[in-house]
């Protein structure tokens, strides 16, 4: 990196840049913080040293105490070194602050430069016949002195501040407090950024970038024009705003190896846009159109490059996490599909369960026709009046005994639901259903009250095994009303036509030579008579007003 040529700029530029900055105050505050940190490190080191000395003095006995002291010794050394580094950093910052104060004191002020310019203008205005030649020469020599003084001051300040920053020590991370001979953890994840850097070094890309691309970036960054333009607020902006900077091995390794999460992604982008906002604010505050234009160009490239780099790192991390969780998530995703895989094995049982729906059809394939129940009830029709005498009771019991075969099939068959029995057609014959139900009730009551003979027990005992094999009969739902009570008859047909006078049998009505009107007149309403025995109800429908019933003619 070449140093800027301070002699190329007038002293007004150096004086304005040096006097318009924040001053040595922030550097002194930072130095004070480093001093405090150095003291804290030293106190912690003293406390740990006292603890280890107490352990060695006999607080603990055995090999464990020796292992404890050995494990804490590297950390104690790091505390001492960190304290020294913090103190050195504070000293370097104080040196830079002192250099700034010295440069500010040696720099010609803007007031001196302004007075020189004002005096030069007066001398030039009153230089009649060259009487002010010597004062003008002295004034110009004084301005040249201030020019050289400003350039020398800036060069000295740059040298001192650069040396102070370069000599500042860097503190290494604190070592782990582990056993001296403890093996390193094998479960630690490898540093992917370092792996990518090694791979880029192996294929030769790092050497190509350092020997070809990086010198070109340095040449563009160190142009005097850009250095003079951005040295006041962000001298690194020409480098960060160069697209070739994002092709560096470090940036590529960061994009492909850094474990980026959502929080880090937002934090990195927020920091970048904060810097960009500060650069834009400084550029617009300068009021220089060239500075504003170059700042907009460089900050745009910096924003686009940073977004692309961080987005690649985030997408790569999300893909790796998804692939790592995929083996654990597959069983959870396949759990809802497990019943579908077992469907062929249980299909037979599932379809067998649908056989119960066959009863809803009312016509089973193996069931006999539903005619026998009608024949069983038919003999009860000639006896419309039931008699309470006990004489018919034996006949009701002994009559079905000789032919026991026909009744069992209707009992074992599933009851039809669609109403194929006699009860559904009871409304066709008057009192048929009611007589059958009454006869059934009387017969049932007699059978319950009359003891059965011993001869009827043998067929029942013989039929017992068959009844055990047959399924249990489902009870027929009780009908609270007669069969015809469920039927509805519309006595009055509903038509959508308005009532009109019938033209049939009337012939052609109206005067001769007139056109016959095809559509008859609409009825206007009903005639209501005065109050009489019928209560003023309508008597005669209202006929068309042009219909003369006496002459059978119609005036149109």
From Swiss-Prot:
| Effect caused by changing residue 249 to A | Does not affect interaction with NCF2 and ROS production
User: Which keywords belong to this entry?
Assistant: Host cytoplasm, Host nucleus, Secreted, Virulence
**Residues forming coiled coils:** none
UniProt lists compositionally biased (Basic residues) regions at: 472-481
- UniProt superkingdom: Bacteria
The entry's family comment says: Belongs to the mycobacterial PPE family.
**What does the function comment of this entry state?**
Inhibits nitric oxide (NO) production in activated macrophages. Acts by inhibiting expression of the host inducible nitric oxide synthase (iNOS). PPE2 is translocated into the host macrophage nucleus, where it interacts with a GATA-binding site overlapping with the TATA box of NOS2 (iNOS) promoter, and strongly inhibits NOS2 gene transcription. Reduction in NO production in turn facilitates intracellular survival of the bacilli inside the macrophage.
What is this protein called in UniProt?
A: PPE family protein PPE2
